[in-house]
Structure formats: C-alpha cells, structure tokens
C-alpha cells in the first residue's frame, strides 16, 4: 500500500497545488477537483474497469474510454490528468491519488479526521465533548467518525493520524495483564 501512496503523492500534490492556485479565480475549484477525483476513484475501483485497465495496451484508447465514461464529470483539466496518468500507466492508482488529495485538502483547511471506536453508541453530548477536546488538543477543526465495537467492553478508542488514545476497558485489561507479567 505504501508503494501506491508513493506513486500517488506527486499526482495528488500537483492537482492540489493547481486547484489552490485556480481557487483564487473560482473558490469552488478545490471542491470540484475533489468531486472529479472521487468519481474517477470510484470508476477505477469497479471490477470491469479494472479488467479493462489490465487488458488494454493502448494508452490513448484507455484514456479516451475513461474520459467518455466520465463525460460530464470531468473538465478539461480532469481530462488532461486522465490522459497523463494513462500515458504513464498509472490510472489504477487514482483511488490513492484521491486519498492523498483529501489529506492535502484537510491540511489546507486545518481539518483532522478523528475516528472514535466505542463499545456503545455515543450520544450527541458525548460526541460534542470529544470534538471539543480533540479540537483543543489538535488546534484544528475535527471531523468525527464514530463506529461501534462491542469487544471493547466499555470506553472508547480515539485515533487520528498522529496518535491513539485507548480508553477502552479491553485496553486497560491488556495493559494490566502486561504489567502483571513483569
């Protein structure tokens, strides 16, 4: 997976820099690029498209097919990206390009994705407390993604790109077991 990220990062950075530069003229440019990349990413993930990517040797035919499928979803710059990536045989990394692009956008907008895994459904008050605490700790706006894992027994695990806070009962039991083994 890290190889895909390494390949995708320069494309994502170039698209992001271009989108930010163009956003001086049109404020919605970054969002438009996010939508184009998301659409391309979903298209490329499709099984039939994956088969077509591996079976077609002509990069021009490949690019033209992808562009014709996307028709209204891509502007001229999006089409140029498809042509460039097809020419370099990199269309299969578009999902990774989209993920990297999202990371650049989040950094640009001072956003952080925070995943909360809890033993039970969190109510709105609990979610707001976590958001407030994480915004204070990270000094940026937080987007909270919650999911339930009953194997935690109680408590929650909070994850960002930089760190993990394990406040789950399962985590405490595991730490206690490790201490008792010493």
Swiss-Prot record:
Keyword ATP-binding (UniProt): no
UniProt entry keywords in alphabetical sequence: ATP synthesis, Cell inner membrane, Cell membrane, CF(1), Hydrogen ion transport, Ion transport, Membrane, Transport
Cellular component GO terms, alphabetical: plasma membrane; proton-transporting ATP synthase complex
Protein's UniProt keywords contain Ion transport: yes
Membrane topology type: Peripheral membrane protein
Xref: InterPro entries: ATP_synth_OSCP/delta_N_sf, ATPase_OSCP/d_CS, ATPase_OSCP/dsu
Subcellular location as annotated: Cell inner membrane
Matches recorded under NCBIfam families: ATP_synt_delta, PRK05758.2-2, PRK05758.2-5
PANTHER family for this protein: ATP SYNTHASE DELTA CHAIN
Reported function: F(1)F(0) ATP synthase produces ATP from ADP in the presence of a proton or sodium gradient. F-type ATPases consist of two structural domains, F(1) containing the extramembraneous catalytic core and F(0) containing the membrane proton channel, linked together by a central stalk and a peripheral stalk. During catalysis, ATP synthesis in the catalytic domain of F(1) is coupled via a rotary mechanism of the central stalk subunits to proton translocation.
Family: Belongs to the ATPase delta chain family.
Subunit-level organization: F-type ATPases have 2 components, F(1) - the catalytic core - and F(0) - the membrane proton channel. F(1) has five subunits: alpha(3), beta(3), gamma(1), delta(1), epsilon(1). F(0) has three main subunits: a(1), b(2) and c(10-14). The alpha and beta chains form an alternating ring which encloses part of the gamma chain. F(1) is attached to F(0) by a central stalk formed by the gamma and epsilon chains, while a peripheral stalk is formed by the delta and b chains.
Name listed for the protein in its UniProt record: ATP synthase subunit delta
């Amino acid at each position: 997976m890290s190889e895909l990220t390494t390949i995708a990062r320069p494309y994502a950075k170039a698209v992001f820099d271009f989108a930010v530069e163009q956003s001086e003229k049109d404020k919605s440019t970054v969002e438009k690029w996010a939508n184009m990349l998301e659409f391309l990413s979903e298209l490329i993930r499709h099984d039939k498209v994956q088969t077509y990517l591996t079976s077609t040797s002509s990069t021009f035919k490949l690019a033209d097919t992808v562009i014709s499928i996307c028709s209204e979803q891509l502007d001229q710059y999006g089409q140029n990206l498809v042509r460039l990536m097809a020419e370099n045989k990199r269309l299969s990394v578009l999902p990774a390009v989209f993920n990297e692009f999202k990371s650049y956008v989040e950094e640009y907008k001072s956003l952080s994705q925070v995943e909360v895994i809890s033993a039970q459904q969190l109510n709105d008050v609990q979610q707001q407390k976590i958001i407030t605490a994480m915004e204070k700790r990270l000094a940026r706006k937080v987007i909270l993604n919650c999911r339930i894992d009953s194997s935690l027994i109680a408590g929650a695990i909070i994850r960002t790109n930089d760190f993990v806070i394990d406040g789950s009962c399962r985590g405490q039991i595991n730490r206690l077991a490790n201490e008792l083994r010493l």
